Amino acid sequence: MFVNRGYMRPIKPLRVNIQDYDVIAVGTPTWWYTMTPAVKTFLHNENWKGKEVIPFMTNGGWPGHVIKDMKKACTEASFFDEKQIQFDFTGGSELVTPQKEIENWITNIKNNIW
């Protein structure tokens, strides 16, 4: 697998211009301790100057360095209230992160950004 070697997958152009937005939430599952290749490509291809990014990720118990990698890719952005959302380690859909914690995170974003 090329994920652990920094592979960036070609992606189709977005149908929206992120320059029209001040705040952008970007999420990804964890693959080989980092973000998915498509998300990595997206983050590296955009101009993040003056943008507020809300990074979040999902994982099965091994968060790796996803958030750190996302921040590194979004050069010149500022960041608000990152979040790791954990599911069970067997690859299932059982949420480990308490639902209330996720709801509080969303409320914090709504109260402080919008």
Residue ranges and their predicted role:
Residues 1-114:
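FMN-binding flavodoxin-like domain, especially the glycine-rich phosphate-binding loop
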